[in-house]
């Protein structure tokens, strides 16, 4: 029903907002000490634990990107379509708009899943590690941790990727 969809959407928004907040707060802690390497190491070790966990409410949260730093963040074909839509919308003079996508899909077992995706935009602080003018020491550290890094040369407000939440829906 529409009411159920609305409840699920509100839960999804709250859950993703909390996940994004935890992610951002921890990175900011590393940055407050002017320690980009510390923030980078957190990204490498701890963020995956935060992002890719299933919880008791049948949710799965992923962080995906068309230009990932971490090889685990490549999108599925379905997620790639969402990211491409976000990029297209962003280019159409929506540089400050919060871009979201919601849909109910069938999974590989023909079960209904609610999908909520929210674009991740590049902020000023993100350019330290994802821009075109990265400090050489930091660049070496990034290459050590992520030899196949593609998450560079972003500009302010570019779409970095998205948080995508999947939730099982009982019929």
Protein language model regions, located:
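The canonical Cys-X-X-Cys-His
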Residues: 123-133
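Extracytoplasmic c-type cytochrome modules immediately beyond a signal peptide or single-pass transmembrane anchor
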Residues: 2-123, 137-171
């Amino acid at each position: 029903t529409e009411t159920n969809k609305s409840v699920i959407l509100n839960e999804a928004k709250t859950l993703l907002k909390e996940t994004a907040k935890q992610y951002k707060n921890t990175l900011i802690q590393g940055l407050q000490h002017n320690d980009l390497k510390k923030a980078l190491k957190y990204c490498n070790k701890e963020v995956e634990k935060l992002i890719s966990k299933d919880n008791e409410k049948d949710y799965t949260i992923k962080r995906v990107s068309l230009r990932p730093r971490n090889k685990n963040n490549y999108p599925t074909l379905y997620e790639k379509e969402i990211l491409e839509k976000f990029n297209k919308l962003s280019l159409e003079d929506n540089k400050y708009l919060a871009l979201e996508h919601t849909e109910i899909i069938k999974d590989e077992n023909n079960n209904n899943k609610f999908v909520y995706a929210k674009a991740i935009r590049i902020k000023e602080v993100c350019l330290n590690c994802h821009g075109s003018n990265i400090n050489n020491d930091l660049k070496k550290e990034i290459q050590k941790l992520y030899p196949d890094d593609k998450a560079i040369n972003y500009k302010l407000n570019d779409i970095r990727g998205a948080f995508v939440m999947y939730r099982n829906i009982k019929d």
